[in-house]
């Protein structure tokens, strides 16, 4: 028999509910209350037992219309998410309800969103590289299959476009499933993503789960777990390799901070919740490879005021296997994706995993770019003429490498007018190796801008030569 209680206090999204002594619900249980204003069921999640047979719960939708004394029913279980192939191509909210107006979801099962991480004995320890087809990532910050990758960057440097390109490449080139969690981002961006995925034909391999900026903090705080639960089903039951995108993990922390303050907890550093590390760990530890399949997670991380030492990005760092740093300076040069080749790293940039040739080319590229960076002060003060012949050559090659790290994206075709390019890792390594060896010293640097493979750069140089003549 489900326990029943009644509302005794409402403060914004926080609702206190009183139960009989023997019917007190567990922490994280979902409670249901019918909103008299619209007749819809509102889900509350129990967060605290505050004494006097009263629980403090956080609402996962607006509490407008609720009044004291309304009856609340304990469902006896946590929030559940629909899982299985029936959710592919659909848009859900935090409680698994469809928000795309395409009718009910034919779920194969319903799983609770609070689940333990896989046991250490179930996890897979071999490391495999996940090919993305994006040159700068595959060369300098390769993604491990089943790993966690962070996209760091301030506002407007291209995190979401990069995420969309990855979804497209994995769905079309590798026929993989993707789960996208829109955590506290703009509703317009979610709508754009859905429409663009329909155009690109990748929607049938993707599930979109949204808890957007306008929603209460409870929804934004839990939507990542709903998406992760859907991904876990594909991994554990269907044995698939799944890509989980979280845009934006900072908003997950921000929502947690709001919930924490509303629950009356004492804030910690910079006003964040005292449970920051635990909240992050509960989400991140479930993202891993098992013997059955893998979940590779790509997380866009907004860096507040471009300060990478802020507790939110700093806590996320400790969980990551690779970090892709997007730089405003590179975006200002018009080079997209605006990935910083010197700040972006990966734990698997190791000859034992990627092979000697790839490793040496990657380190060679970073060495040339670092030398160019060191020389920029001299160039700014004295000009190129004061450099040695060797340094002049390094500057020329570095500028070509910088431009060759750019790439036209499929999802940006309608903005740029350039056809998107998918570049295999072997072609990426070959191209940069040839630039480092000086095979293309005679080509103009603009030939390397916004092309795919090195052969395309050579063809572009021929065209430029022809048009100049």
Swiss-Prot record:
Its main location: membrane. GO terms for cellular component: plasma membrane; proton-transporting ATP synthase complex. Keywords: ATP synthesis, ATP-binding, Cell inner membrane, Cell membrane, CF(1), Hydrogen ion transport, Ion transport, Membrane, Nucleotide-binding, Translocase, Transport. SMART domains: AAA (SM00382). Its EC number is 7.1.2.2. It is found in: Cell inner membrane. CDD domains: ATP-synt_F1_beta_C (cd18110), ATP-synt_F1_beta_N (cd18115), F1-ATPase_beta_CD (cd01133). It comes from the Bacteria. It catalyses: ATP + H2O + 4 H(+)(in) = ADP + phosphate + 5 H(+)(out). Belongs to the ATPase alpha/beta chains family. F-type ATPases have 2 components, CF(1) - the catalytic core - and CF(0) - the membrane proton channel. CF(1) has five subunits: alpha(3), beta(3), gamma(1), delta(1), epsilon(1). CF(0) has three main subunits: a(1), b(2) and c(9-12). The alpha and beta chains form an alternating ring which encloses part of the gamma chain. CF(1) is attached to CF(0) by a central stalk formed by the gamma and epsilon chains, while a peripheral stalk is formed by the delta and b chains. This is ATP synthase subunit beta. It comes from Pseudothermotoga lettingae (strain ATCC BAA-301 / DSM 14385 / NBRC 107922 / TMO) (Thermotoga lettingae). The lineage of its organism: Bacteria, Thermotogati, Thermotogota, Thermotogae, Thermotogales.
């Amino acid at each position: 028999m489900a326990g029943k209680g009644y509302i005794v206090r409402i403060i914004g999204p926080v609702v206190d509910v009183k139960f009989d002594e023997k019917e007190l619900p567990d922490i994280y249980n979902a409670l249901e209350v019918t909103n008299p204003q619209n007749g819809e069921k509102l889900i509350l999640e129990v967060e605290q037992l505050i004494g006097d047979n009263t629980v403090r719960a956080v609402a996962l939708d607006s509490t407008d219309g609720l009044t004291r004394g309304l009856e609340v029913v304990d469902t006896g279980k946590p929030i559940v998410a629909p899982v299985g192939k029936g959710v592919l191509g659909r848009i859900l909210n935090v409680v698994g309800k469809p928000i795309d107006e395409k009718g009910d979801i034919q779920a194969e099962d319903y799983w609770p969103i609070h689940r333990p991480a896989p046991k250490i004995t179930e996890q897979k320890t071999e490391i495999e590289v996940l090919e993305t087809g994006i040159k700068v990532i595959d060369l300098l910050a390769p993604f491990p299959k089943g790993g966690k990758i962070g996209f760091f960057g301030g506002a407007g440097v291209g995190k979401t476009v990069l995420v969309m390109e990855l979804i497209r490449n994995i769905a079309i080139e590798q026929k993989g499933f993707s789960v996208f969690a829109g955590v506290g981002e703009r509703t317009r961006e979610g709508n754009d993503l859905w429409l663009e995925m329909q155009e690109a034909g990748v929607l049938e391999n993707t599930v979109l789960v949204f808890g957007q900026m306008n929603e209460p903090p409870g929804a934004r705080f839990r939507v990542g777990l709903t998406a992760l639960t859907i991904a876990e089903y594909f991994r554990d039951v269907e044995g698939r390799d799944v890509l989980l995108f979280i845009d934006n993990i900072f908003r997950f922390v921000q929502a947690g901070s709001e919930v924490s303050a509303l629950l009356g907890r004492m804030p910690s550093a910079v006003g964040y919740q005292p449970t920051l590390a635990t909240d992050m760990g509960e989400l991140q530890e479930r993202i891993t490879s098992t013997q059955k399949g893998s979940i590779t997670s790509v997380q866009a991380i907004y860096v507040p005021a471009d300060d990478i030492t802020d507790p939110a990005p700093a806590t996320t760092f400790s969980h990551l296997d690779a970090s892709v740093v997007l730089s405003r300076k590179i975006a200002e040069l018009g080079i997209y994706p605006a990935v910083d080749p010197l700040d972006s790293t990966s734990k698997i940039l190791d000859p034992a995993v990627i092979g000697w040739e790839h490793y040496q080319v990657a380190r060679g590229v970073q060495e040339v770019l670092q030398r160019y960076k060191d020389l920029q002060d001299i160039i700014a003060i004295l000009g190129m003429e004061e450099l040695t012949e060797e340094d002049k050559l390094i500057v020329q090659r570095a500028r070509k490498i910088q431009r060759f790290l750019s790439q036209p994206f499929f999802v940006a075709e309608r903005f740029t007018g350039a056809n998107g390019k998918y570049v295999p890792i072997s072609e990426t390594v070959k191209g940069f190796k040839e630039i480092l060896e000086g095979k293309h010293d005679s080509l103009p640097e603009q030939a390397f801008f916004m092309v795919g493979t090195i052969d395309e750069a050579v063809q572009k140089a021929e065209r430029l030569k022809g048009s100049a003549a």
